[in-house]
């Protein structure tokens, strides 16, 4: 049932497993781009502004680039929970109903960048006609929250547009996308009895009416789990175990992405490998380049373009990575050969 709902198949299996990695922007070119985690872009390619928003976890910013590496003057500061120092943005999501962007942080906040908000003295350039700082809407730092991922989808029961947030110290949480008030989920939502209690949510990605959640060991280590739920938090499927190493980024491939078309991709921060899974959750292999498994040190977010000039083709996979020690940064692209 899930495979049919996801509309995934393995029709491209006869093709060669061959992909090319290209760096678009690195921290050597832009010193703000350090250990970038999440990346997001508008859903609608017809919007006038379709750049990628990149969460720079170390520098506390969301910097904007197009698919060719051209930077945008606008950079948005993600505030820290304490009000002082530097923010720590991880996951990010775009709201197509408002054109707003949302950011979650390691120190337990959810912040909003309001696309319609104007600075007190607006100018004519991009950086001058938009506000340059996000606003904290939820601050759960005092409760020990550590937010690592966020996804936007409609709740299956209420139909309310909802932000689902992966709290490494508390499970998956839900917030009304308009008011940011917490939503009470059913008992046992987003839990898997076969995942040890020493694992907690990390990455989260929405696809149609499903939420894909990665789980990593709270003490670190080179394993992990990936589950698929409906938006009420009911467990539907667990991806085949044994091929994860701190999974975080998730993407669903289009029909023209080479050997691994119409599959689920999972990026592993620990190993830098990207694994492909069928709609039934069966492991199909890692993406390769030159006959070897493709490795991107410190890999975080992965996402396909929306077809616009700014965010790139729908069959090009864009990624963020922080390097082996998470002290550098790369925004890049992966194409099928």
Specify the residue positions occupied by each region the protein language model found:
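Bacterial N-terminal signal peptides
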Residues: 1-9
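Sequence/structural signature of beta-propeller domains
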Residues: 14-337
